[in-house]
Amino acid sequence: MLYLVLFLVPFNSIQITIYDQENFQGKRMEFTSSCPNVSERNFDNVRSLKVECGAWIGYEHTSFCGQQFILERGEYPRWDAWSGSNAYHIERLMSFRPICSANHKESKITIFEKENFIGRQWEICDDYPSLQAMGWFNNEVGSMKIQCGAWVCYQYPGYRGYQYILECDHHGGDYKHWPEWGSHAQTSQIQSIRRIQQ
């Protein structure tokens, strides 16, 4: 009698494939964890990529510094695919890491008028292409508390401009001042916000 035994390999929840040329050409490498410097993996930079599983943050510079770009499941054949309608021309990524706290269904964030969680506040559990159109009184946010999940905040309405990725498991979910949003943060201007897809 012959018995067939199947061994199920756990499905990896995060995976990204990077390429050193546009349109998925050239050298390629797969990752299932953070990469603080693609140069240490014999890449000059990342020019295209595919996110197979999970959500990731790509950075303009090494050591997770510089402009941030949200990388959700899908293909990014060129720089303009990850920068979207961003007016800032960044043709490469030098480091990236997975977002472990993305939980689209249960995401919750509270935005505050001023730094240190002072002033008017608004609890958000949904995507808003324009905070002002939905009732927020100005184009700036002083501080934010991430109760659950991960969010991407944009400088302008319609998910445009600088991207700031905020997670409940970084800074304890507390972002007291706009410089904590990322090393590239230059202003407290936030006009659209959305949950990160896992």
Swiss-Prot record:
InterPro entries: Beta/Gamma-Crystallin, Beta/gamma_crystallin, G_crystallin-like
Coiled coil: none
Residue ranges of domain Beta/gamma crystallin 'Greek key' in the record: 14-53, 54-100, 107-148, 149-197
Residues annotated with S-methylcysteine modification: 65, 100
PROSITE patterns named in the record: CRYSTALLIN_BETA_GAMMA
Gene3D superfamilies per UniProt: Crystallins (2.60.20.10)
Region (Connecting peptide): 101-106
Biological process terms in GO annotation: camera-type eye development
Domain of life: Eukaryota
One Gene Ontology term of the molecular function aspect: structural constituent of eye lens
Entry-annotated residues carrying S-glutathionyl cysteine: 65, 100
Pfam families per UniProt: Crystall (PF00030)
Region annotation (N-terminal arm) ranges: 1-13
Keyword Cell inner membrane (UniProt): no
Keyword presence, RNA-binding: no
Keywords tagged on the record: Eye lens protein, Glutathionylation, Methylation, Repeat
Signal peptide range: none
Subunit structure: Homo/heterodimer, or complexes of higher-order. The structure of beta-crystallin oligomers seems to be stabilized through interactions between the N-terminal arms. Interacts with CRYBA1.
Job of this protein: Crystallins are the dominant structural components of the vertebrate eye lens.
Family according to the record: Belongs to the beta/gamma-crystallin family.
Entry's free-text remark on domains: Has a two-domain beta-structure, folded into four very similar Greek key motifs.
Protein name listed in UniProt: Beta-crystallin A1
Species the sequence originates in: Mus musculus
